């Protein structure tokens, strides 16, 4: 496994497994919403009313609608919690205001 994916894969897998609604912000500022249906090394399959294949290199931020826990590969198997943070919420609000 590539070292950079040791956090990414468990996080995306928890979002997929728990069917957590997510907002995905692209590097060009576009906001996509849906549930992660599947993913691999290069793409995320995002499902809403339709399925969209989103290339990871185009993604800036993935924001879950609620906190998600996943087990990391850290010694001792400690839990890591990820949820919406203030910066992501501000970005979301600014994007909504701009529309």
Curated annotation (Swiss-Prot):
One of its GO terms (biological process) is regulation of translation, ncRNA-mediated. It holds the Pfam family Hfq. Residues 9-68 form the Sm domain. It comes from the Bacteria. One of its GO terms (molecular function) is RNA binding. GO terms for cellular component: cytosol. Keywords: RNA-binding, Stress response. Coiled coil: none annotated. Residues 70-93 have a biased composition (Low complexity). PROSITE patterns: SM. Residues 64-99 are annotated as: Disordered. InterPro entries: Hfq (IPR005001), LSM_dom_sf (IPR010920), Sm (IPR047575). Disulfide bonds: none annotated. Belongs to the Hfq family. RNA chaperone that binds small regulatory RNA (sRNAs) and mRNAs to facilitate mRNA translational regulation in response to envelope stress, environmental stress and changes in metabolite concentrations. Also binds with high specificity to tRNAs. Involved in the regulation of the bacteriocin carotovoricin. Homohexamer. This is RNA-binding protein Hfq. The lineage of its organism: Bacteria, Pseudomonadati, Pseudomonadota, Gammaproteobacteria, Enterobacterales.
């Amino acid at each position: 496994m590539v070292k950079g994916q040791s956090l990414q894969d468990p996080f995306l897998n928890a979002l997929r497994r728990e069917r957590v609604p997510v907002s995905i912000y692209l590097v060009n500022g576009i906001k996509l919403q849906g549930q992660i249906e599947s993913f691999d090394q290069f793409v995320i399959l995002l499902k809403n009313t339709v399925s969209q294949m989103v290339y990871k290199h185009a993604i800036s931020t993935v924001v879950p609608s609620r906190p998600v826990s996943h087990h990391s590969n850290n010694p001792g198997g400690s839990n890591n919690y990820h949820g919406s943070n203030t910066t992501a919420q501000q970005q979301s609000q600014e994007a909504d205001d701009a529309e």
